[in-house]
Amino acid sequence: MIASSIKAAVVKDNARQPGDTGSPEVQVALLTARINELMPHFKTHAKDHHGRRGLLRMVSRRRKLLDYLKSKDAERYIALIAKLGLRK
C-alpha cells in the first residue's frame, strides 16, 4: 500500500484541476505507483501467485483506463504515457 503522502503527491502532480481525484490520468498514475511499489516484492517472492493475481488485476485495470483515455482524447493519452514512462 502506498503511503498517503505519496498518494497525495501523485494526485497533485496528475490532477487536471485542484481537487481532481477521479480523472483517468489520476487513476492511472495511482495504479502505476501501486504497481511500481509491488514489483520488488515479486522479484524476491516469485511463487506468490495469489499476490500476482492482484497485480495482474491492477495492470489490467490500468490498461482499460488507458484505452478509454486514448479513445476519448489521444493528446491527453500521449502526454500521460510520456509523463509516466509507460511506453518505450
Curated annotation (Swiss-Prot):
It comes from the Bacteria. One of the primary rRNA binding proteins, it binds directly to 16S rRNA where it helps nucleate assembly of the platform of the 30S subunit by binding and bridging several RNA helices of the 16S rRNA. GO terms for molecular function: rRNA binding; structural constituent of ribosome. Part of the 30S ribosomal subunit. Forms a bridge to the 50S subunit in the 70S ribosome, contacting the 23S rRNA. The lineage of its organism: Bacteria, Pseudomonadati, Pseudomonadota, Betaproteobacteria, Burkholderiales. GO terms for cellular component: cytosolic small ribosomal subunit. The gene is rpsO. GO terms for biological process: translation. The keyword rRNA-binding applies. This is Small ribosomal subunit protein uS15. Keywords: Ribonucleoprotein, Ribosomal protein, RNA-binding, rRNA-binding. It comes from Albidiferax ferrireducens (strain ATCC BAA-621 / DSM 15236 / T118) (Rhodoferax ferrireducens). Gene3D superfamilies: 6.10.250.3130, S15/NS1, RNA-binding (1.10.287.10). The keyword rRNA-binding applies. InterPro entries: Ribosomal_uS15, Ribosomal_uS15_bac-type, uS15_NS1_RNA-bd_sf. NCBIfam families: S15_bact (TIGR00952).
